[in-house]
Amino acid sequence: AMTVPGTKALVGYSGIYDLEKAAITMKTKDAQRIAYFCDRDPKVLREASPINLIPKKNVPASMLVCGTCDVTVECEQSEMFASALKKKGGVCDLLTYKYYDHNVSSKTSDKMEEIFFKSVDFLTTYMK
């Protein structure tokens, strides 16, 4: 979304935004996962990381959702991305759910409906 001209808004759920710093990328010993992340090639990871793709102007409004107990993709990924977006002048709503894991927005979560409606409201506001 960051590289598509005219993008007005982005909503991210439990996302990896800096592949070079994500625990799922750097700490895994799983060969399949390592291969999925291009054998951890720093150049590829840097070029594919949304945190490095934020435009210099017209930063899309963003809403990021994460759970503080996410062991799949640490919540710090969303926190770092939110900070970087704001530094570039973007609007970013960071919704952090204490004690929730990677499935904070899944259909099994008691927060699913709340997050869905917050997403709709956010997109309705910024897609005008």
Task: Annotate the PLM regions.
Residues I16, E20-L53:
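Mobile cap/lid helix-loop segments that gate and shape the active-site cleft of serine hydrolases
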Residues P50-V59, E76:
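Conserved serine/cysteine hydrolase catalytic core
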Residues E76-K128:
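C-terminal catalytic histidine-bearing segment of alpha/beta-hydrolase fold enzymes
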